[in-house]
Regions:
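Structured, basic alpha/beta domains of bacterial-type, RNA-associated proteins
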Residues: 2-20, 24-75, 80-137
């Protein structure tokens, strides 16, 4: 394998990001800046501007918009979780491309896994925290 073939092969190896119950696998390929999530346009898939902006925030921070094609495969959870998973996967992929971005991404908190999960429902009450109505008499 030549050096350019090796660089292309590593550039297309997917990186994973997770949030809540969602998982995103992202491939970054140097190109014109086209994006697809599960074969669809980001706005068509995520449906809200805020989720699209949050998902592609790492590209904005690194000033790399229009320099990479992003191909993402997302599964599990809801749209917010998928957007967060996509954000982390893109940040990890950018750091793999350019190690100098690690400090910048770290300061923005883009490389840290958000460990918050849904709290379980407890027995003897209707939800995780809510209690049944108390009657004194």
């Amino acid at each position: 394998m030549t050096a350019t073939a090796t660089a292309t092969a590593t550039a297309t190896k997917p990186l994973t990001g997770r949030r809540k119950h969602s998982t995103a696998r992202v491939r970054l390929i140097a190109g014109a800046g086209t994006h697809s999530i599960n074969g669809r346009e980001p706005m068509e898939y995520l449906k809200r501007d805020t989720l699209v902006m949050a998902a592609y925030h790492p590209l904005t921070v690194a000033n790399m918009i229009g320099k990479y094609n992003v191909i993402a495969r997302v599964s599990g959870g809801g749209l917010t979780g998928q957007s967060g998973a996509l954000r982390m996967a893109i940040a990890r992929a950018l750091v793999r491309e350019d190690e100098a971005l690690r400090g910048l991404m770290g300061k923005e908190g883009l490389l840290t896994r958000d460990s918050r999960m849904k709290e379980r429902k407890k027995y003897g009450q209707p939800g995780a925290r809510k209690r049944f109505q108390f009657s004194k008499r």
